[in-house]
Amino acid sequence: RTSRGLGDVYKRQLFNISKQSVNPGKNFGPYGLPKTALLSLCKQYAVDYGSLGIRSNGVNADRIRSGLLNDGMIKSRAKAREISTDEYMKGNLLTKEVKAEDVAKAFFHLAVSKKTTGAVLTVDGGNIAASLR
C-alpha cells in the first residue's frame, strides 16, 4: 500500500544513480550501498508503475565535481592512485572530464523520452569497471 501511494509522488521524478552502485571502490561500501538499492528501486518502480504511465529512469554518473567530490577529495583520490588531479578527473576511455552539464543533459534526455522506462543512462566518459553488465 505504501509503495502504491508513492506512485503519485514519483510521477515526475527521475532517479540519480552513480557508478558506486556498480563499482563501489575499496572502503566506499557505506556510501555505495544506498546507491545500489536505488538502482534496484528504479528498476522495480518501472515494473510496478509502468502500467500507470509512470516512468522510472536513472543516470549513472562518475567523477562529477560536487560538494562531496570537491578539490580536497579529488586530491586525495588522485594521490592514492599516484596520478595528477587532472588525470584523475579525466580517467575514462574518452579522457574527458565529465561536467555537471553533461549529467543535466542526460536527465533532460530521459525526461523527454516519453516511451523510456527502467533505463539507466551512463555518463562517465567510459568507465568500463562501472558499466552495467
Set out the residue ranges of the language-model regions:
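Single conserved hydrophobic/aromatic residue that forms the stacking wall/gate
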Residues: 1-10
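Structural signature of the Rossmann-like NAD(P)-dependent dehydrogenase/reductase core
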Residues: 11-18, 55-60, 117, 122-124
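Conserved catalytic-site region of short-chain dehydrogenase/reductase
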Residues: 21-24, 129
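Active-site loop immediately N-terminal to the catalytic Tyr-X3-Lys motif
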Residues: 23-29, 51, 95
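Active-site helix of classical SDR
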Residues: 34, 42
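Alpha-helical segment proximal to the catalytic Tyr-Lys
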Residues: 47-48
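A glycine/serine/threonine-rich, flexible loop-to-helix segment
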Residues: 51, 64-91
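C-terminal substrate-recognition "lid" of short-chain dehydrogenase/reductases
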Residues: 96-123, 128
